[in-house]
């Protein structure tokens, strides 16, 4: 509005000035001689008009400045006081809510969370370890499952058979050792060396088997691959694979020496530091009628050894001593374990060689069995334990040599033999294993 007033006043003054100029020109025409007077008058009037215009301009500019200042003041004052009130209320409410939650959060929730973490941390560590072991076991099982579990038999080169017609024989799981009910046992023949046949897997089930199912139908192959998913793949010679793992009705024969192997004896006349602590046995020799007292000492772990092996083998005593001396000692040994010796062989059953001594011929053991039961005279299931190599010189491949024992209380030879004898009871021919003590000679083929 002030600007409009300024422009209107300015226009009005200019119009007035034009009218004055027109009148002055008319007066000059009318009043020629008085030209100077009129000029003075016009100049005077012009100056007055200019001064008025300047005053009006200054007044309008000052008025505009005042209006601008008033407008700025109005803008500085908030238009909506209600919005400010709502903002203040929200801030106050948030502050009050934070104050209300401060004590419960830092005094109840935070301590409970820290206690929960402390109690559950060991459980979480155990859980992670279990998961890690499970993953590792799964990976190992997967790698084992990728291995082909099959068995191959090599027949004579003259036979020509079709691999598709090969019969697959399976062996059920063993109750002991590392054959479990969850293992798959696969035994497969392969007529061509190096060829791969598709193995037939039979899941082992814990059920009762007949003798015909437990025994292998064919044992003519020279070597066989036998294994389980957990055991892997192993190459065994033919005669090391048992005819039936569970068929333990027919026990092998374990022939044991007496003196220096199971016991040590000393006559009463000899001076020995421990002679008075041994078991006293009176021996009467029939021919001369002389009675002699002997102090008998058992080898360490003798009773435990006889108790264990009596469950696995038929025990036989074979000694180079006289019958009159051996029988009282054997009777005393039999009173120390639940079983007994099935046979007793003495010096009269040995073979005497000049310059060598008494030799124990194991064929007498098989001959007595053959006469009683009509079985073969092979020594594939006979083991002899002796401390003298001369005693088993005729059957070296059937022998297990132990150190001769006299009085060492820390001796553990009998105890160390138990795991080996437990495994040997499953072998088809004990000579294939015991002959390995000869080294490379055991692999020489005539």
Swiss-Prot record:
Subcellular location: Endoplasmic reticulum membrane; Nucleus membrane
Chief location: endoplasmic reticulum
Enzyme Commission number(s) of this protein: 3.1.3.16
One GO-annotated biological process of the protein: regulation of phospholipid biosynthetic process
Keywords: Endoplasmic reticulum, Hydrolase, Membrane, Nucleus, Protein phosphatase, Transmembrane, Transmembrane helix
Chemical reaction(s) catalysed: O-phospho-L-seryl-[protein] + H2O = L-seryl-[protein] + phosphate; O-phospho-L-threonyl-[protein] + H2O = L-threonyl-[protein] + phosphate
Domain FCP1 homology: start-end pairs: 247-424
Positions of transmembrane segments: 87-103
Ranges for region Disordered: 53-80, 132-168
Function recorded in the entry: Catalytic component of the NEM1-SPO7 complex which acts as a phosphatase and dephosphorylates the phosphatidic acid phosphohydrolase PAH1. Essential for the formation of a spherical nucleus and meiotic division. The NEM1-SPOo7 protein phosphatase is required for efficient mitophagy under prolonged respiration, as well as for reticulophagy and pexophagy.
Note: Present with 377 molecules/cell in log phase SD medium.
NCBIfam families associated with the record: HIF-SF_euk
Similarity annotation: Belongs to the Dullard family.
Name of the protein this chain belongs to: Nuclear envelope morphology protein 1
């Amino acid at each position: 509005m002030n600007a409009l007033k300024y422009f209107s006043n300015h226009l009005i003054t200019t119009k007035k000035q034009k009218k004055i100029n027109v009148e002055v020109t008319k007066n000059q025409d009318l009043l020629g001689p008085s030209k100077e007077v009129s000029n003075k008058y016009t100049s005077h009037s012009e100056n007055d008009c200019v001064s008025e215009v300047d005053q009006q301009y200054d007044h309008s500019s000052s008025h505009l400045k005042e209006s601008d200042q008033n407008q700025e003041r109005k803008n500085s004052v908030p238009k909506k006081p209600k919005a400010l009130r709502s903002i203040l209320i929200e801030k106050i409410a948030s502050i009050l809510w934070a104050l209300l939650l401060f004590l419960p959060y830092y005094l109840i929730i935070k301590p409970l969370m820290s206690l929960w973490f402390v109690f559950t941390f060991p459980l979480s560590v155990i859980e992670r370890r279990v998961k890690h072991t499970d993953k590792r076991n799964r990976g190992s099982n997967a790698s084992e499952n990728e291995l082909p579990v099959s068995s191959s038999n090599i027949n004579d080169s003259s036979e020509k058979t079709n691999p598709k017609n090969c019969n697959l024989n399976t062996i059920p799981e063993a109750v002991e050792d590392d054959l479990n009910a969850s293992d798959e046992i696969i035994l497969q023949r392969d007529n061509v060396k190096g060829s791969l046949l598709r193995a037939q897997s039979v899941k082992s089930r814990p059920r009762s088997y007949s003798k015909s199912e437990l025994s292998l139908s064919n044992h003519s192959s020279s070597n066989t691959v036998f294994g389980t998913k957990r055991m892997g793949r192993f190459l065994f010679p033919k005669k090391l694979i048992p005819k039936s793992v569970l068929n333990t009705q027919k026990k092998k024969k374990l022939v044991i020496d007496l003196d220096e192997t199971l016991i040590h004896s000393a006559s009463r006349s000899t001076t020995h530091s421990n002679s008075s602590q041994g078991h006293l046995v009176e021996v009467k020799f029939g021919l001369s009628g002389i009675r002699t007292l002997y102090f008998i000492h058992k080898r360490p772990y003798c009773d435990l050894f006889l108790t264990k092996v009596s469950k696995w083998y038929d025990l036989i005593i074979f000694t180079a001593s006289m019958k009159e001396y051996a029988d009282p000692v054997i009777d005393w040994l039999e009173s120390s374990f639940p079983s007994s010796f099935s046979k007793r062989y003495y010096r009269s059953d040995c073979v005497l060689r000049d310059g060598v001594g008494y030799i124990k011929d194991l064929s007498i053991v098989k001959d007595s069995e053959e006469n009683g039961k009509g079985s073969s005279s092979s020594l594939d299931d006979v083991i002899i334990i002796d401390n003298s190599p001369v005693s088993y010189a005729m059957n070296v491949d059937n022998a297990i040599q132990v150190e001769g024992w006299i009085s060492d209380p820390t001796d553990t030879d009998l105890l160390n033999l138990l795991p080996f004898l437990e495994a040997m009871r499953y072998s088809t021919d004990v000579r294939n294993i015991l002959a390995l003590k000869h080294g490379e000679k055991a692999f020489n083929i005539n």
